[in-house]
Amino acid sequence: MVACLLHDIGYVRGILKDDDADGYVVDAAGGKVKLPRGSSDAALLMHHVDRSILFALDRLGTIDVFDAKRIARAIECTRFPVSIPPQDEQIEEEGSLLRAADLIGQLGDPHYLRKANALYYEFEEAGVNRQLGYGSPADLVDLYPQFYWNSVSPRVQTAIRYLNVTASGRQWIANLYSNVFRAERDVSLSGPQH
């Protein structure tokens, strides 16, 4: 649960002890990045997982009721795609469920496709649109089904089985697939227009 609460805290500027006017800490060695004037927290997209991990280790590492390393390993699993394989089965399950909750929570939002404009400009600020193949907000919607089926679906199936047990969980599944269906069918007014 704590990893759920902390996995995106790395977007917030000033949360790490050494964040200052010279920049924001982005790794355990104390490396920093200086953001351009006027940047939003979205500019930390490429560093937010590392920053979240550093925050968890620093703030929870001395509190006995928390296993800060376990929380940090679960947060690592929210990096998309996962870059470091979990070291044990328990972390694999916890981390994969956290990753699935993160993905389903975003992609199952009934307004997700309408948010493509804002998401595009967040990606633009972070400098990742080109590498993702996005030239406009409409590309996020056009490429969404391929992204979902190839990159997301294989990583959320266990969570979908759990969600299918409750009515509210089934609603999240329906929302998730509705967004994919609408993007596949090019339903107008679902997001950025061509």
Which ranges hold each PLM region?
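Active-site alpha-helix of zinc metalloproteases
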Residues: V2-A3
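Post-HEXXH active-site segment of zinc metalloproteases
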Residues: I15-G38
